[in-house]
Regions:
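C-terminal region of N-terminal signal peptides and the immediate post-cleavage residues
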Residues: 19-33, 256-262, 280-300
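C-terminal subregion of chymotrypsin/trypsin-like serine protease catalytic domains
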Residues: 174-281, 287
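Hydrophobic/aromatic ligand-binding patch that stacks against planar heteroaromatic rings
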Residues: 17, 49, 171
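Serine endopeptidase catalytic core focused on the charge-relay Asp
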Residues: 41-150, 174-175
């Protein structure tokens, strides 16, 4: 019963968001470059690139585990299987070979690579700081660009802005040259001068393994930092846990606004969020209901 309710609420939410009226003709859904997918039960990531000939799409390896089932956000009939690079290791601060493919089930249609084109550049392609590197996250929903910084194994570092939770796997391309691969996150080093970081993108083919020490040296050279540093590697996936944290922050923000505005906006926010979260992760319904109670108490 809960699964049927989730699908119903999710469909209503998508229809309201897109402004689809009853009886209107709707095109058959396809897997979109830059679109959102759900890996396993609740991990949200972005499609980097579609390969129509092979019937696969690329995304980040840290989005799931081998064999996880994948659905397209808002079009749950489009399903496939998640296969990460066999060389990827799901370890803290490990970033090498962070790519995966989704092998789609028979009959799933793949859309064009409308952001980047179909050219996939090889790891040996020469890039310089003059090359404009861009991305488009499924959550950010905006084209953002920076410049090439460095390369380590099959990972390319650039000055792209940080992504939001859910942007993992987003397409990263070099304008005029082609696609690098999926967006992997941001690698940071902290020192007495502050925190500095570079964004990562990974060519979707197995490359040389490397460790944290090598990545630290790449960052220190780029930022001209000597001395000890602390390294962290961020991965912008969205799960039920961090989606809830983001919603909590939004509710806190709303509570500080004019009371009448809160009463008008809060029900709409909760309705949309409830549909999305229930469709993605039924087990968090009780959490959302708790937020409703808190919001109602604030409005009294």
């Amino acid at each position: 019963m809960r699964g049927g309710t989730a699908r119903g609420i999710g469909a209503v939410t998508v229809a309201l968001t897109l402004g689809i009226s009853h009886g209107a003709a709707v095109a058959a859904p396809v897997v979109q470059q830059g679109g959102l997918i759900v890996v396993g039960s609740n991990v949200k990531c972005t499609v980097a690139m579609n390969d129509k000939n092979q019937g696969v799409s690329y995304t980040s390896a840290h989005c799931g585990s081998n064999g996880d089932r994948v659905t397209v956000k808002g079009a749950e009939g489009l399903t496939g299987t998640f296969i990460p690079s066999p060389l990827y290791r799901d370890e803290e601060d490990y970033t090498a070979n962070d790519w995966a493919m989704v092998v789609w089930d028979n009959g799933v249609a793949l859309g064009p690579n409308w952001l980047s084109g179909d050219t996939l550049i090889s790891p040996g392609t020469t890039l310089t700081s003059k090359d404009r590197v861009c991305t488009y996250g499924g959550v950010t929903k905006a084209k953002r660009c920076g410049s090439f910084a460095a390369r380590l194994g099959n990972t390319v570092f650039s000055t792209l802005p940080d992504g939001q939770a859910g942007d993992s796997g987003a397409p990263v391309w070099v304008e005029g040259k082609g696609v690098i691969g999926p967006y992997s996150g941001v690698s940071n080093i902290s020192s007495s001068s502050g925190v500095r970081g570079l964004s990562r993108a990974v060519h979707p083919e197995d490359g040389r393994d490397y460790g944290t020490d090598e990545e630290i040296e790449v960052l220190k050279r780029w930022f001209h930092i000597d001395g000890p540093v602390v390294h962290t590697a961020e991965r912008p996936v969205e799960t039920a846990a961090n989606a809830g944290a983001q919603l909590g922050k939004r509710l806190d923000s709303l509570s500080s606004e004019d009371d009448s505005a809160v009463r008008g906006v809060l029900p709409v926010v909760l309705a949309i969020v409830l549909g999305v979260l229930v469709a993605a992760a039924p087990d968090i319904v009780s959490i959302v209901e708790s937020w409703r109670s808190i919001a109602a108490a604030r409005g009294q």
